[in-house]
Amino acid sequence: MKKRHLQRALANITVTSGKDFHLRDHDPAAVPPGLTAETAEARLADGVARLSKLQERLYAQGTWSVLCVFQAIDAAGKDGTIKHVMSGVNPQGVQVHSFKAPGADELAHDFLWRVWRELPPRGHIGIFNRSHYEEVLVTRLHPEILQAQGIPPSLLGKKLWRHRMEDIAGFEQYLGRQGCLVLKFFQIGRASCRERVSLVV
């Protein structure tokens, strides 16, 4: 697959602005023309080698950090993607954190508190396997988590979700202004997810 074809394919699945973007308008199973398993493997190997060199520069300069956020449903391939893509980097410069259900200490603080604690230092790459987006996804589906957070009743309601999204956007903008590049990777299709789960069960 030629580089320009890959760039065009990536442009179709890359979101640079949330304005007028809806996941339902994009087929997560779409495969770019000319992409085969062999070309994908070759591109992955090239990308891993390039990432390794970029990581060395990132570490040596010590001014920027990179935060890769993987947020998707179970069986979406987050673990496998992290394992394969990061296989060629120096593990001393990478921290992977998987966010599980919040514990008592985390519930006693604001919802971004546990995220702040895991941010990568300058010169390093941080990877979040699940993230602060859990607070507008899982918490919405499991109100008992929200109840356990002890938020004053006057702050609850529909406005809470809008406020949290604003807080997340502000948090990520702040990180960018402090020299932390935030890269976000979301979603696979439900059909792909069902297929992956059926292979395990």
Q: Model features per residue range: what roles?
A:
Residues W64-S65, G123-I125, G179-L183:
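Loop/turn-to-beta-strand initiation segments
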Residues Q149-R177:
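ATP-hydrolysis module of ASCE/P-loop NTPase motor domains
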Residues A191-V201:
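Conserved small/polar residues in nucleotide/adenosyl-binding loops
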Residues G34-R43, Q92-L160:
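Conserved nucleotide-sensing/catalytic segment adjacent to the nucleotide-binding pocket
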Residues V69-M86:
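Glycine-rich phosphate-binding P-loop
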Residues R50-Y59:
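Pre-Walker A adenine-sensing motif
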Residues M1-V48:
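Charged, amphipathic alpha-helical linker segments immediately N-terminal to NTP-binding catalytic cores
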Residues L67-A72, K184-Q187:
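Extended hydrophobic secondary-structure segments that form protein cores and membrane-embedded regions
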